[in-house]
Amino acid sequence: MPNCFKFHTVIERHWQKPYPVLSFLLKPLSGLFAKIAAKRRTDFLSGKRQSEKLPVPVVVVGNIHAGGTGKTPIVAALVSGLQEKGVKVGIISRGYGRKSKAVHVLNAESRAEDAGDEPLLLFRKTGAPTAVGSSRAEAGRALLAAHPDIGLIVADDGLQHYALRRDVEIAVFPAADTGRTDLDLLPNGSLREPLSRLDSVDTVVVSGGKADALFRPSENMFHSRIEVGRIYRLNNPSEILDTGRLKNQTVVAVAGIAKPARFFDSLRNMGITVKRTVALPDHADISAADLPDADAVIITEKDAVKFSDGICTDNVWVLPVCAIIEPDLAAFVLERLEDVPKAV
């Protein structure tokens, strides 16, 4: 795991600031990847490969990057917005990081190893019926069988999962990449599909800041920003942390997410002095035994769902976040669904 993690870290740094030697080696592979990805999508669009239409509208929230775009909080915000408008929403996802490959409809007893950390977090934050499966269509069928009153399904990720037809496509794109001219497809870059793919989605949500003035891939553009909530105790969420009392304490921050630096910066921006940071691979397993010794250990919500109730973690605290999307993305989705659905 350490060697794999180190190699992945090198590649991610290359994606952010390309190394000429690596680009020379990886560029041909990116060209091959582009041809394979384009053919796969064309096969689904032409009907050469079969795709399935669920009996309710499907809204896909995904990205053309290989993770780290801030998509999960945006999915939670969209689902909550639709719920506020009286829509019975369900969520489907692949469930990255879980140990089982079987379709699983989440319930109060579901654990991260059953569902994956992100779907479990979405389920707990929104209360929306949720199912996971490597086949999004199969997960959708299972979800509708368990909750037949669902009127709309939001697919967390899956923009490239063309085996499931969708009625609305939402692409999340990081603001930091909107002005870049050196983006490339995997493995030389972090893109799963070319930038031109953004021309065919219903809307683009720019996450984490303002977009470059020249970035306008869609006539329908939304922007999201992250707001942090009050830090709470892991084993007693009603107890809020008084950050003022941390001044003379040892504080360690731990994150198993795609862009851990964002989490660490958020804590520092709150005036918290973090003595040590621990960055784990995205979706990494984590338990109380893995946490460093400190007066206070602060973790992400995504990591918090991996801990079982009743474990002695009195010194572990959780920083909640939420996405603020402007303008109203939920209203846009409902307006879009009044039009003729787009079969993909």
From Swiss-Prot:
Stated EC number for the protein is: 2.7.1.130
**Broad EC category:** transferase
Q: Which residues bind ATP?
A: 65-72
What does this chain do? Transfers the gamma-phosphate of ATP to the 4'-position of a tetraacyldisaccharide 1-phosphate intermediate (termed DS-1-P) to form tetraacyldisaccharide 1,4'-bis-phosphate (lipid IVA).
The gene coding this protein: lpxK
State the organism named in the record.
Answer: Neisseria meningitidis serogroup C (strain 053442)
Which SUPFAM superfamilies does the entry link to? P-loop containing nucleoside triphosphate hydrolases
Name of the protein in question? Tetraacyldisaccharide 4'-kinase
Q: Which family is this protein grouped under? A: Belongs to the LpxK family.
Q: Which domain of life is it from?
A: Bacteria
KW Protein biosynthesis (keyword) present:
no
